[in-house]
Amino acid sequence: MTMTAAPDDTALPWIAGPAHDIATKQRGHALLLQGHPGAGVFELALRVARTWLCETEGADAPCGRCTACHLLSSNSHPDFRALLPELTQAELGWSVGGSETVDAGDGEGKAKKKPSKEIKIEAVRDAISWTQKSSSRGRAKVLLLFPADAMNLVASNALLKTLEEPPQGVRLLLVAEDAERLLPTLRSRCQRILFAGPTPEQALAWLEGQGAANAPVLLAAAGGHPLSARRLAADGFDAAAWIALPKRIADGRWEPPAGATVPRLREVLQKLCHDAMAVAADATPRYFPAASLPPAAAWIKLSDWSQSLARLARHDEHPFNAPLITDSLLAEAKAVWAKPRGRAA
């Protein structure tokens, strides 16, 4: 399994310490890393895997110079395998060979299939078969699953025996934002490790180092998660646009950035709904500056809106008519702040 690009875990200074502790102090064959993707939990898992596979004697971090490190940096190490859903691959900009490759269609005239949100049973079975083969470089083999809760029930059950009795030298890294979404039988076979992510000061310094203007606004917009804030900026949300967004949506004057997907738009609207409910409850908003929010809306409208967005979240990756859904979402949001019309005399 090869990938054309590898995230640079060395660019996230807050993961070096936790990665060192996990790689050198945790002796279990199966680890469950729990943390937010926007805080760098996936990059943390990669750094742990690279430490385990580094061939420099006594290394407690990837040396970056040995053959194994070079193979890992190009995602061509034969003893490392990562299982990611097609959708996650697309979001990370990775091109992955083998069972998890995005289906681009089988010929002219055939519709392009939407990337899957699941780690498929075929990929899990193929990975299990891979674990049973000898190490190509005579050291450990590492299987990483991200996000692990993207496995469906069949795939999860297929992995159980390997988690319980892995072949000699095989280590597994399961990465999830919410470990409770995994089967209890999976969780019980892993050592769970919580990753808190960077401190607010570390997150802000890193984001400013990425060239983000008015970084505090973007960081708040991303719930304090710096990688998510960088993605927001890449999606066309600068600080000024983010501050103007709530009232523009309430007035029906907001245009989503070019290329904004339905899931991304839904996430933005859920954040606005969260903060609007906070204002209605005399609480502090989390994602938007308080002064940027429209006047408090009726609680029943906000509650209905929140439930509608939650229902959409369960299927917003399906190949529906995206422009139509976008228009509907914006109209629904505007209606939350619409004043009731007076009765005719």
Where are the model-predicted features located?
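Clamp-loader machinery-focused feature within the broader ASCE/P-loop NTPase space
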Residues: 2-154
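Charged, glycine-rich active-site and insertion segments that engage polyanionic ligands
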Residues: 1-51, 57-60, 67-68, 132, ...
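A short local structural element in Rossmann-fold oxidoreductases
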Residues: 81, 156, 183-187
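Conserved P-loop NTPase nucleotide-binding/switch module
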Residues: 162
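Short N-terminal helix/helix-N-cap motif within the alpha/beta-hydrolase-1
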Residues: 153-156, 338
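Loop/turn-to-beta-strand initiation segments
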Residues: 137-142, 167-173
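Residues immediately C-terminal
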Residues: 150-151, 165, 181
